[in-house]
Amino acid sequence: MVTRLLGRKMGMTQIYNEKGQCFPVTVIEAGPCTVTQVKTKDKDGYAAIQIAFGVRRSKNISRAEMGHIIPKGDLKPEDRKKAFDRQLKETKNAPEILREIPWDGKEDLKVGAKLDVSIFESYKKVDVIGTSKGRGFMGVVRRWGFHGLPATHGQSDRERAPGSLGRQHSISQGVPPGKKMAGHWGVEQVTSRNLDVVQVQKDKNLIFVQGSVPGPTGGLVLVKESTWTAPKPSTVVSKKTKAGQIVKKGH
């Protein structure tokens, strides 16, 4: 069963429910995606499929990737190059992105099969993976929420400075690994988990999810079945309680 689709963030809007309450939703164009490769446990050691989404000019794609997309057929090796060159000239468009997704191997999927947004009609919650917006080079105050140094008592230009970076005369001298410092912010993979599916429009390949989705308008995203579960509160057995009685940690 296929539980993931490539898509594009179209933007945000508002929707009213049956009670007249207004809440924000993100519109995602999920699919249609074309199956470009099928992997099985017998041949490849694991089951997965490769799907393609979007359209871009074939002149902007490498010859090796075009050879992966264009079917080779049952031609002889000496005839494949001529046939490939002919198909390469005839092919004007190519997929914008290729992505391999897990697959249980139970369905009879073949190369060229189409996958649309209808696979999410039975889902109540989904996860959306995207790339966050790039914010450029940021200081520690905006990037990490540092408080900054005092604005008075003799200082002149250290209000937004990070302060000390490490100790000099100690065993762990120098800047410790993972120290929060100024640097590039954004352009990272971000996952929005457990988003409610508000509406699915199969004819337009649109899915409406409640809340925000990472990335700019027009950015590529991956929509998948939500597997997130709320963490359970940690519990410990107190020595003062009776045997078998569980109390919450910190109580």
Could you describe each region identified by the protein language model?
Residues 1-251:
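Extended basic (Lys/Arg/His-rich) segments that typically form rRNA-contacting surfaces
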